[in-house]
Amino acid sequence: MRRQVKKVLREKADDSMKPGWDVYQPSNDVVYAFNHYMQGSQIDAEAREKAEKAFQEAVKKHPFHNNADHAVDFHGTTVFRNAKGKVCGVLIPKALPSFATSMAADVLECAVARTSLRSALFGGVSPNSGIAGYFDYRGTPVELKCRKTSFTYEHTKEWRSVFPMIDYTSAIYKAALPDHWKAQDAAVPDVVRIHGSPFSTLTVNERFRTASHTDNGDFDNGYGVLAVLKGEYSGLSLALDDYGVCFNMQPTDVLLFDTHLFHSNTELEAKEANATWNRLSCVFYYRAALGEQPCVEEYRRRLKKAKEEKSTSLSFNHIEQKDNGENTNKPAPVYPVPLTPFSCAASAWALRGCAAAMLTRLHGLVRENASLMTELFGEPVEVADGLPRRAPEEIIPVHKHTNVQMHYLGGFSEKGDILNEAMNKRHYLDKENLQKMFGEEFVNIWTQSRTHWLQLVKKEWEHQKETNPTRTRFSWNNTSAMNFAFFDLCDVAKQLMCGAFGDREVNKKEEQSFWGMFAAHLDNACINEIGMLQGSMGMHKLNVKLKDYNFGGTRYLKDMPPEEQERRRRRRLEIEQARRRAPICNSESGDWLRNEAFDYQTEDVAVNYEREQWITPENNAKRFGFPERGVYGAEGAATGTISVLIVLPKPTNHRQKTCELPTSREADRIMKNPAAQRLLCAKPCNIGLSTSSNKSRTVLCGNIRIDKVFDGGSVGGKMYDFVIMRHLLAATTGEREPLECLVRWTSLARYCTFVVEVDLLDRHHYILKSEIGEEYSAVSEICFSALYSATYARDKVNLRTTPCLLSFIDKSGNMLESRFKFNGSPLNTVAFVVRRREK
């Protein structure tokens, strides 16, 4: 069953889930967990049309973006700035010591833990998210606000294992962006800062992919920090959607970024739909509401109460109202940067200073002079009439066809196949299954409430049968004790549902699905446990009463005497407390719901790095070479001549013989676009150089000196600022030749090399529909080889995919900084920015 996240259908984020509110799993996408279960194919055409229109409008507000939607993938240490020079993101690979992320992951996995019951009830693999640290809980039904999260409260001892990761992350933030770190550190109230850091809250996500969103509630004058703690996966890069760039992240990597920019995750790069993968990530941030007056007053109230009770373990004597700044929760303004391979390379931290200034100069020149871009790379940054973009119908959707929210009247749908599904899953509410998820106390409450209602139903049924022995249908008395017992049982069931969904807001389809199983469970109990006839109670009657509970229960409560209203409220609180005390990851039970103690910072302990023989956070941050001012400074202007070497594949004596090309829709897409036709008709671009000479040819363009040479030729021992290897590896064979080619030419670059190649993988490779992907794979190599042969006059062509090219780059002793994708390129060209690995 495909499931898609509810959040794409809502305009406002659920603060309790930020920043993972609009997440989904690539193999388990959700707008509604039980879309087929609740609606199925029986929905009428008019309703389907309205639903699809509503869904499309929602997706416009919160779209999912794929890797192909972005021009740049950053891999190395990167500082990406907007057109006004403001830092948008800082990527630091291998930033955190692995022992620190491992220790933290062991604890924080419990914060997102779900049991197998939830998957059994609602299908698929549960996407997990949780919060730790401190939270304001505004806009939630939690009565007591501005305090520890339930996870932190219940895992005080284990929580200490997270502190090294907190310290390392804070030190990196301080070293890279000291001004913002200081502003955030000055604003966060001391009572809710995590281990002396400028963070108040962690959001932990497991197996999550987010749609485009901004993080609501973060401190406006700070940055959020994303770290990947553990995982085995490819893809899922963090993308800044308005800038067209992605940050590739793996375990121990850290990304500092402006969370008020729209961002999302690209697709999981796994071709098999059932591929095994996992990813645990953590977002560190300051929840600005915790510094606003309502929360400060709550801290003061608790402190005053603790003093009146003569508490001896107070960590504070007074609460200071700090300057919290202005937090508008509005998206940050966007100042786009035109993207070229040079601007892409200029973002590499390793190329800062003189190299970045040169790259910025080259970027400006190719922006002003499109012919210079073609002279250097063989094609423009973007080709309007080249390889066409994929149509939506060619791509596996994030969701299957879904039927979006309609007016909810409580209860559940009574369509035949849906009722059958509910009956098939009714046993998940049996006691032995509930014990897998909930503690004994809560299961006992469920059992007692269920037994009490069944006893009253049995008593009422027997009375009705005595009055009329031929009766076959149960008559429900709305004023009876049985009715009130049913409402009480519904209160217990509602807490069961909340627990199964991890206290997140449940969308209406999920809620209807649950109540359908609940009704099927009770109807079966009436038949098999108290001897009622098949259909005497019936799903329809229970559905009517569930609608009454959802929309009429509050009205009945208001009509009750005050003492009964208070008893019902206490009863509901008792049920919720029992459910929350369910053991998760062997947590220590605690009365979190009613906790009013002034227990801020009671979990804090010092970390002795010297005793543990761990690198200190400050020394760890120094590894990345950030200056005292951080990464804010823009590069100066380049002066003097910039030298560039272009290396071309040597043409053979004749073009590749014309071969019979396949005929198919995919072959036509590659070969018959106007840009491809121009390549086939034009003279090969490397014919102008003399094939009889092995020496380079020099072209001057202002203060740019461009040398051109064939692969195998000589440059007379010169070094160059930058080298552009233009489609060389496609002219090599085997494993050894491409490595030797890379080693030779990258060694001549003072700063970096651009490895420009055809990528045999379709840009949407991992999300192409299977029939489209198979057709593409069958023709792509022969078609692109024909285009390459026409462009470079080569007999033998060995085209490769990005993963294969990345392997060559790594084995050749080079480091990958980034990848640039030429939009619409008829050769599906990509440029890898690489530099020699430091010894």
Swiss-Prot record:
Biological process (GO) annotations held by this record are: base J metabolic process
Cross-referenced Gene3D superfamilies: 3.60.130.30, JBP1, DNA-binding domain (1.20.120.1440)
Tell me, according to the record, the phenotype of the null mutant. Answer: Does not affect growth, gene expression or the stability of some repetitive DNA sequences. The genome contains only about 5% of the wild-type level of J in their DNA. Cells lacking both JBP1 and JBP2 show a complete absence of base J.
For the ligand (Fe cation), the binding residues are H213, D215, H263
Q: What is a single cellular component term in the Gene Ontology annotation?
A: nucleus
E.C. number: 1.14.11.6
Q: Which cofactor does it need?
A: Fe(2+)
Q: Give the positions of the site Involved in J base recognition, conferring specificity towards J-DNA.
A: D548
* Cofactor binding summary note: Binds 1 Fe(2+) ion per subunit.
Give the reactions, separated by semicolons, that this protein catalyses: thymine + 2-oxoglutarate + O2 = 5-hydroxymethyluracil + succinate + CO2
- The UniProt entry lists the main location of this chain as nucleus
Question: So where does 2-oxoglutarate get bound?
Answer: R279
UniProt subcellular location: Nucleus
Per the record, the domain of life is Eukaryota
Q: What is known of its domains?
A: The DNA-binding JBP1 domain (DB-JBP1) is necessary and sufficient for binding to J-DNA.
Q: How does it assemble?
A: Monomer. Binds to DNA as a monomer.
Belongs to which family?
Belongs to the TET family. JBP1 subfamily.
Q: What does this protein do?
A: Dioxygenase that catalyzes the first step of DNA base J (beta-d-glucosyl-HOMedU) biosynthesis by converting thymine to 5-hydroxymethyluracil (HOMedU). DNA base J is a hypermodified thymidine residue found in the genome of kinetoplastid parasites, which is localized primarily to repetitive DNA, namely the telomeres, and is implicated in the regulation of antigenic variation. Also specifically binds to base J-containing DNA (J-DNA).
Q: What is this protein called?
A: Thymine dioxygenase JBP1
The protein's gene is named: JBP1
